[in-house]
């Protein structure tokens, strides 16, 4: 330890000596080039004069005003290089360069002062002042360099460098792929890359708070690319007609991807003119009573979201069973002539004294309705009325002439991926009426899912925007089985807590854990934590610095830490996404995780939108004189359905009364 201290003291003496010689050279420069003024001040040192004359004669030291200055600065630099000062966090390269620049200008660029037309004493004073000030500035800059903290840990306070990583830069295209161009940050610069969804059949989730760019950056691109590649498509358009307009116009402009050009269909309850008609409980697509039960189950849980958490409860199952029985009754009555959703609602709203004799007169429904009959026969009228009211009250909210119009006839079937008749179907909701329309549209969802998830059909896509606004029965099963049937599912919603609230904890977990492709814009809370855990950890550098008077000690270690921490996900800007994709056996993607900006050509999109055509009028309600009769025709359809149900009930009661084996049912009133 003593030897080390001696060495340090010796080094300090050498540095001091070099600095002293440097200062002497500066003084010599002033003495030589301002000699006239010095003599005027009465300074006459003959020995110094002779020494300087010898230096100049032998070495040419004073042939130029710069020589002594250059030697002085060289010795000053050596003295600063060997000096170890106390490190300071406030010393920056900016301060150092400022001091050095000022010193250089004052020290080297002041020769013109000697030629100023001023008194000799003034010129000498000014020259000496600039040389001295410049030297001090150079000295300060040199000393600050020795005190500079070379590892400033505060340069990356958000740990961006550790949490940036190389991402996929290849474009991997295939018959089914979706490809999104990106920009990502890695090693202090922005790079171009690609998100390659090479297997869309393993389902995709698009998350993000409102305004994070879900639809703009991801969902819209999926719709366009899948239409270009010949997918049949079902689009749930929560804010009709945003997505529907894109799908309609892109199909008009890119029909070349299809062997058989698909037809474009729209379900829109707000405007019957721009809506096709479709019966979601068409008898041809119901094979047994379980299909009727699924339809009743879907409609009831969409009307009563709280029932999702209470499945199996008595007052949840009772109205579902009753409504399923009515649907199946309409299926078997006159070969399903009146099997529509509006007819089922109207039938339910008849007196229960009329409903039960009619339903139980059919052997297929007798056992199905035995709990209701037991309550009726047992005198539990209040319980029975409560069960019926549990079905009537929510369904009565759906009594609407426009809704009856759309759902009471069929202009197309829901097998959208039929190779012989492919379809692009867009169903539109309205945020102001989402509870009512969402229930009806949920019925279309459940029927479509069952019809498209079959072997040998055309590749198809199911795109659901704002998933929590409808209850999508069978969603978990669709995700799990759709891959083998070439059904690409894309679900958009805001965060996982919405899914848990509206689908229940178990079903929400199945959805979250079975999707293969996930995109997330800004999300917070538990959703951000869940995603961060899904993306995993990476080995990151950790550096610590200890500063004392004599030295700086640095330690570097590594530890596993979150690749994309929740705080990063919570602070994503609009258009920035994190996520992961799945790959195939023959299309390997080494880096599946991404943290990037999805690049959207805004100018191109604006040009496309300007050229978009509105969805045309589908049904013309004009009469022979050109007058718009939409309201009259829609109301006439509404009255017709009510009258048909009244007539059905009257005819059925008459049939039962005339049948010796059944008329006892009427006596139970």
Tell what function each PLM region has.
Residues 1-212, 216, 221, 547-549, ...:
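Basic- and hydrophobic-enriched, low-structure N-terminal and domain-boundary segments
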Residues 171-190, 369-382, 517, 523-524:
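N-terminal short leaders/motifs
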Residues 158, 408-413, 548-551:
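A glycine-rich phosphate-binding loop feature that marks nucleotide/adenosyl-phosphate handling sites
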Residues 479-481, 485-488, 492-582:
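Conserved ATP-driven motor cores of ASCE-family P-loop NTPases powering translocation/secretion/packaging/pilus
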Residues 150, 195-487, 503, 567-588, ...:
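P-loop NTPase motor domains
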Residues 592-596:
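N-terminal charged/capping segments associated with class I S-adenosyl-L-methionine
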Residues 77-79, 442, 446, 517, ...:
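Hydrophobic alpha-helical segments involved in membrane association or supramolecular assembly
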């Amino acid at each position: 330890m003593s030897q080390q201290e001696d060495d340090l003291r010796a080094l300090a003496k050498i540095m001091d000596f070099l600095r002293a010689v440097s200062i002497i050279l500066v003084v010599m420069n002033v003495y030589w080039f301002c000699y006239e003024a010095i003599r005027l001040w009465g300074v006459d040192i003959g020995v110094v004069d002779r020494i300087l004359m010898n230096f100049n004669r032998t070495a040419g030291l004073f042939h130029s005003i710069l020589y002594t200055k250059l030697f002085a600065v060289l010795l000053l630099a050596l003295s600063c290089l060997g000096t170890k000062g106390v490190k300071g966090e406030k010393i920056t390269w900016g301060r150092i360069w400022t001091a050095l620049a000022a010193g250089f200008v004052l020290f080297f660029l002041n020769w013109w002062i000697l030629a100023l037309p001023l008194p000799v004493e003034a010129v000498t004073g000014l020259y000496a002042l600039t040389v001295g000030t410049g030297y001090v500035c150079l000295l300060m800059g040199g000393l600050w360099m020795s005190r500079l903290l070379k590892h400033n840990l505060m340069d990356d306070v958000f740990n961006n460098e550790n949490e940036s990583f190389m991402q996929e830069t290849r474009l991997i295209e295939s018959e089914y792929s979706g490809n999104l161009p990106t920009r990502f940050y890695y090693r202090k610069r922005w790079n171009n890359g690609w998100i390659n969804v090479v297997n869309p059949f393993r389902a995709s989730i698009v998350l993000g708070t409102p305004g994070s760019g879900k639809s703009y950056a991801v969902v819209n691109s999926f719709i366009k690319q899948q239409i270009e590649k010949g997918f049949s498509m079902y689009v749930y358009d929560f804010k009709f007609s945003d997505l529907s307009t894109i799908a309609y116009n892109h199909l008009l402009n890119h029909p070349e991807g299809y062997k058989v050009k698909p037809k474009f269909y729209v379900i829109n309850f707000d405007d019957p003119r721009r809506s096709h008609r479709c019966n979601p409980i068409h008898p041809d697509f119901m094979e047994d009573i379980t299909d009727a039960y699924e339809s009743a189950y879907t409609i009831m849980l969409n009307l009563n979201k709280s029932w999702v958490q209470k499945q199996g409860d008595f007052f949840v199952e009772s109205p579902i069973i009753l409504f399923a029985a009515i649907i199946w009754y309409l299926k078997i009555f006159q070969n399903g002539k009146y099997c529509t959703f509006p007819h089922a609602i109207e039938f339910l709203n008849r007196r229960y004294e009329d409903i039960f004799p009619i339903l139980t007169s059919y052997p297929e429904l007798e056992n199905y309705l035995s709990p209701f009959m037991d309550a009726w026969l047992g005198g539990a009228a209040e319980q029975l009325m409560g069960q019926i009211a549990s079905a009537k009250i929510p369904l009565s909210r759906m009594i609407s002439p426009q809704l009856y119009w759309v759902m009471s006839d069929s202009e197309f079937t829901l097998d959208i991926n039929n190779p012989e008749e492919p379809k692009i179907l867009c169903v539109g909701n309205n945020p102001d009426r989402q509870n009512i329309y969402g229930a009806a549209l949920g019925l279309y969802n459940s029927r479509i899912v069952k019809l498209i998830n079959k072997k040998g059909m055309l590749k198809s896509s199911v795109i659901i925007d704002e998933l929590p606004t409808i209850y999508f029965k069978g969603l978990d099963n669709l995700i799990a089985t759709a891959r083998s049937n070439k059904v690409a599912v894309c679900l958009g919603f805001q965060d996982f807590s919405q899914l848990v609230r509206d689908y229940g904890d178990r079903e929400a977990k199945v959805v979250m854990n079975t999707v293969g492709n996930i995109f997330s814009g800004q999300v917070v809370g538990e959703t951000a934590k869940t995603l961060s855990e899904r993306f995993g950890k990476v080995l990151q550098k950790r550096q610590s610095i200890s500063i004392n008077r004599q030295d700086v000690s640095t330690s570097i270690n590594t530890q596993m830490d979150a690749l994309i921490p929740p705080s990063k996900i919570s602070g994503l800007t609009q258009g920035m996404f994190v996520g992961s994709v799945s790959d195939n056996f023959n299309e390997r993607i080494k880096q599946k995780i991404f943290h990037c900006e999805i690049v959207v050509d805004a100018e191109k999109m604006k040009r496309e939108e300007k050229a978009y055509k509105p969805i045309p009028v589908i049904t013309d309600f004009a009469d022979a004189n050109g007058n718009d009769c939409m309201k009259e025709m829609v109301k006439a359809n509404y009255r017709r359905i009510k009258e048909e149900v009244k007539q059905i009930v009257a005819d059925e009661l008459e049939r039962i009364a005339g049948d010796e084996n059944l008329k006892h049912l009427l006596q139970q009133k």
